[in-house]
Protein backbone atom coordinates (compact mmCIF):
# COMPACT_ATOMS: atom_id res chain seq x y z
CA UNK A 1 0.00 0.00 0.00
CA UNK A 2 1.20 3.52 -0.75
CA UNK A 3 -0.54 6.73 0.18
CA UNK A 4 -0.30 10.11 1.82
CA UNK A 5 -0.26 9.19 5.49
CA UNK A 6 -3.51 8.67 7.30
CA UNK A 7 -5.59 5.60 7.98
CA UNK A 8 -4.52 3.54 4.97
CA UNK A 9 -0.85 3.71 5.85
CA UNK A 10 -1.66 3.03 9.50
CA UNK A 11 -3.76 0.01 8.54
CA UNK A 12 -1.01 -1.42 6.36
CA UNK A 13 1.54 -0.95 9.15
CA UNK A 14 -0.76 -2.79 11.58
CA UNK A 15 -1.30 -5.60 9.09
CA UNK A 16 2.45 -6.18 8.90
CA UNK A 17 2.31 -7.73 12.36
CA UNK A 18 -0.58 -10.06 11.51
CA UNK A 19 -0.22 -13.83 11.80
CA UNK A 20 0.98 -15.41 8.57
CA UNK A 21 2.97 -12.44 7.25
CA UNK A 22 6.38 -13.72 6.14
CA UNK A 23 8.12 -10.37 5.87
CA UNK A 24 7.27 -6.68 5.69
CA UNK A 25 8.84 -3.31 5.04
CA UNK A 26 7.38 -0.07 6.29
CA UNK A 27 8.32 3.53 5.55
CA UNK A 28 8.75 5.84 8.53
CA UNK A 29 5.31 7.23 9.44
CA UNK A 30 4.44 10.87 9.26
CA UNK A 31 1.57 12.90 7.89
CA UNK A 32 1.72 14.91 4.70
CA UNK A 33 4.21 12.73 2.85
CA UNK A 34 4.01 9.59 0.78
CA UNK A 35 4.50 6.45 2.85
CA UNK A 36 3.49 2.83 2.76
CA UNK A 37 4.10 -0.80 3.60
CA UNK A 38 4.84 -3.91 1.62
CA UNK A 39 3.77 -7.32 2.92
CA UNK A 40 4.97 -10.75 1.79
CA UNK A 41 2.48 -13.56 2.33
CA UNK A 42 2.74 -17.27 1.56
CA UNK A 43 1.41 -18.15 -1.88
CA UNK A 44 -1.75 -20.16 -1.54
CA UNK A 45 -3.56 -22.14 -4.20
CA UNK A 46 -7.26 -21.81 -4.88
CA UNK A 47 -8.99 -25.15 -4.40
CA UNK A 48 -12.66 -25.78 -5.19
CA UNK A 49 -14.34 -28.93 -3.90
CA UNK A 50 -17.74 -29.87 -5.29
CA UNK A 51 -19.94 -32.47 -3.62
CA UNK A 52 -23.41 -33.89 -4.14
CA UNK A 53 -25.66 -36.72 -2.95
CA UNK A 54 -24.54 -37.06 0.66
CA UNK A 55 -28.00 -37.28 2.20
CA UNK A 56 -31.05 -39.52 2.06
CA UNK A 57 -34.72 -38.57 1.76
CA UNK A 58 -35.01 -39.13 5.51
CA UNK A 59 -31.91 -37.46 6.93
CA UNK A 60 -28.87 -35.33 6.30
CA UNK A 61 -28.22 -32.24 4.21
CA UNK A 62 -25.34 -31.88 1.75
CA UNK A 63 -24.96 -28.16 2.42
CA UNK A 64 -24.55 -28.69 6.18
CA UNK A 65 -22.12 -31.58 5.81
CA UNK A 66 -19.99 -29.62 3.34
CA UNK A 67 -19.83 -26.61 5.66
CA UNK A 68 -19.01 -28.70 8.72
CA UNK A 69 -16.20 -30.54 6.93
CA UNK A 70 -14.80 -27.32 5.49
CA UNK A 71 -14.70 -25.71 8.93
CA UNK A 72 -13.13 -28.82 10.44
CA UNK A 73 -10.20 -28.86 8.00
CA UNK A 74 -9.46 -25.12 8.13
CA UNK A 75 -6.13 -24.34 9.80
CA UNK A 76 -3.03 -22.20 9.30
CA UNK A 77 -2.28 -23.95 5.99
CA UNK A 78 -5.84 -24.01 4.67
CA UNK A 79 -8.31 -21.13 4.79
CA UNK A 80 -11.99 -21.87 4.21
CA UNK A 81 -13.19 -18.98 2.05
CA UNK A 82 -16.70 -19.69 0.81
CA UNK A 83 -19.56 -22.14 0.51
CA UNK A 84 -21.94 -21.91 -2.44
CA UNK A 85 -25.24 -23.76 -2.74
CA UNK A 86 -25.97 -24.51 -6.41
CA UNK A 87 -29.54 -25.29 -7.48
CA UNK A 88 -29.68 -28.11 -10.03
CA UNK A 89 -32.37 -29.51 -12.30
CA UNK A 90 -34.80 -31.68 -10.30
CA UNK A 91 -33.97 -35.11 -11.72
CA UNK A 92 -36.29 -37.88 -10.48
CA UNK A 93 -33.48 -39.83 -8.74
CA UNK A 94 -32.19 -36.94 -6.60
CA UNK A 95 -31.58 -37.63 -2.93
CA UNK A 96 -33.53 -34.68 -1.55
CA UNK A 97 -33.32 -31.02 -2.60
CA UNK A 98 -31.60 -30.85 -6.02
CA UNK A 99 -28.63 -28.85 -4.79
CA UNK A 100 -24.91 -29.44 -4.96
CA UNK A 101 -22.26 -27.60 -2.96
CA UNK A 102 -18.90 -26.09 -3.81
CA UNK A 103 -16.49 -25.09 -1.04
CA UNK A 104 -13.62 -22.72 -1.79
CA UNK A 105 -10.26 -22.83 -0.03
CA UNK A 106 -6.94 -20.97 -0.17
CA UNK A 107 -4.34 -23.54 0.77
CA UNK A 108 -0.62 -24.10 0.98
CA UNK A 109 -1.13 -27.85 0.40
CA UNK A 110 -3.94 -28.61 -2.09
CA UNK A 111 -3.42 -32.39 -2.00
CA UNK A 112 -3.61 -32.58 1.79
CA UNK A 113 -6.69 -30.34 1.82
CA UNK A 114 -8.50 -32.54 -0.72
CA UNK A 115 -7.38 -35.77 1.00
CA UNK A 116 -8.61 -34.62 4.41
CA UNK A 117 -11.92 -33.36 3.00
CA UNK A 118 -12.42 -36.69 1.20
CA UNK A 119 -11.64 -38.76 4.31
CA UNK A 120 -14.23 -36.86 6.34
CA UNK A 121 -16.78 -36.98 3.53
CA UNK A 122 -16.37 -40.76 3.21
CA UNK A 123 -16.78 -41.09 6.96
CA UNK A 124 -19.88 -38.92 7.35
CA UNK A 125 -21.84 -39.24 4.10
CA UNK A 126 -25.18 -41.00 4.48
CA UNK A 127 -25.35 -42.05 0.83
CA UNK A 128 -23.55 -44.61 -1.30
CA UNK A 129 -24.11 -42.31 -4.31
CA UNK A 130 -21.87 -39.45 -3.13
CA UNK A 131 -19.81 -37.56 -5.68
CA UNK A 132 -16.76 -35.39 -4.97
CA UNK A 133 -14.72 -33.45 -7.52
CA UNK A 134 -11.74 -31.17 -6.95
CA UNK A 135 -10.58 -28.26 -9.09
CA UNK A 136 -7.25 -26.60 -8.38
CA UNK A 137 -6.76 -23.27 -10.07
CA UNK A 138 -8.15 -19.81 -10.33
CA UNK A 139 -10.59 -20.01 -13.25
CA UNK A 140 -13.00 -22.96 -13.56
CA UNK A 141 -14.93 -21.31 -16.41
CA UNK A 142 -14.16 -24.28 -18.68
CA UNK A 143 -16.74 -26.17 -16.60
CA UNK A 144 -19.46 -23.52 -16.97
CA UNK A 145 -21.20 -24.97 -20.08
CA UNK A 146 -21.49 -28.32 -18.29
CA UNK A 147 -22.69 -26.63 -15.09
CA UNK A 148 -25.39 -24.74 -16.96
CA UNK A 149 -26.52 -27.94 -18.69
CA UNK A 150 -26.95 -29.66 -15.33
CA UNK A 151 -29.01 -26.71 -14.04
CA UNK A 152 -31.30 -26.90 -17.11
CA UNK A 153 -31.87 -30.65 -17.44
CA UNK A 154 -30.47 -34.16 -17.30
CA UNK A 155 -27.08 -34.82 -18.87
CA UNK A 156 -25.69 -37.96 -20.46
CA UNK A 157 -22.77 -40.05 -19.25
CA UNK A 158 -20.84 -38.90 -22.33
CA UNK A 159 -21.26 -35.25 -21.26
CA UNK A 160 -19.87 -36.11 -17.82
CA UNK A 161 -16.95 -37.98 -19.39
CA UNK A 162 -16.03 -34.92 -21.47
CA UNK A 163 -15.43 -32.76 -18.38
CA UNK A 164 -13.76 -35.39 -16.16
CA UNK A 165 -10.25 -34.47 -17.39
CA UNK A 166 -10.77 -30.93 -16.02
CA UNK A 167 -11.21 -32.10 -12.41
CA UNK A 168 -9.86 -34.62 -9.94
CA UNK A 169 -12.72 -37.08 -9.32
CA UNK A 170 -12.39 -38.30 -5.74
CA UNK A 171 -15.76 -40.03 -5.18
CA UNK A 172 -17.50 -41.36 -8.26
CA UNK A 173 -21.07 -42.00 -7.16
CA UNK A 174 -24.06 -40.68 -9.08
CA UNK A 175 -23.52 -37.36 -7.30
CA UNK A 176 -20.42 -36.72 -9.40
CA UNK A 177 -22.66 -34.96 -11.94
CA UNK A 178 -23.75 -32.32 -9.43
CA UNK A 179 -20.31 -32.17 -7.80
CA UNK A 180 -18.63 -31.22 -11.08
CA UNK A 181 -21.50 -28.94 -12.11
CA UNK A 182 -21.27 -26.93 -8.87
CA UNK A 183 -17.60 -25.99 -9.25
CA UNK A 184 -17.88 -23.14 -11.79
CA UNK A 185 -20.61 -21.50 -9.69
CA UNK A 186 -18.30 -20.90 -6.73
CA UNK A 187 -19.15 -17.48 -5.25
CA UNK A 188 -21.78 -16.89 -7.94
CA UNK A 189 -24.80 -16.37 -5.73
CA UNK A 190 -27.17 -15.25 -8.49
Predicted segments with their positions:
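Conserved mixed alpha/beta catalytic, RNA-binding, or beta-rich assembly cores of soluble enzyme
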Residues: 1-190
Amino acid sequence: YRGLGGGGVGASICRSSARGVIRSTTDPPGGGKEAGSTLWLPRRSRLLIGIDDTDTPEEGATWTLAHNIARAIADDKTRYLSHTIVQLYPVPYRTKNCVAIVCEFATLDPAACADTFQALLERYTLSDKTGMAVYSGFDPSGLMPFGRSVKKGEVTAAEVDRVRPLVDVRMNGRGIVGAIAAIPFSTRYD
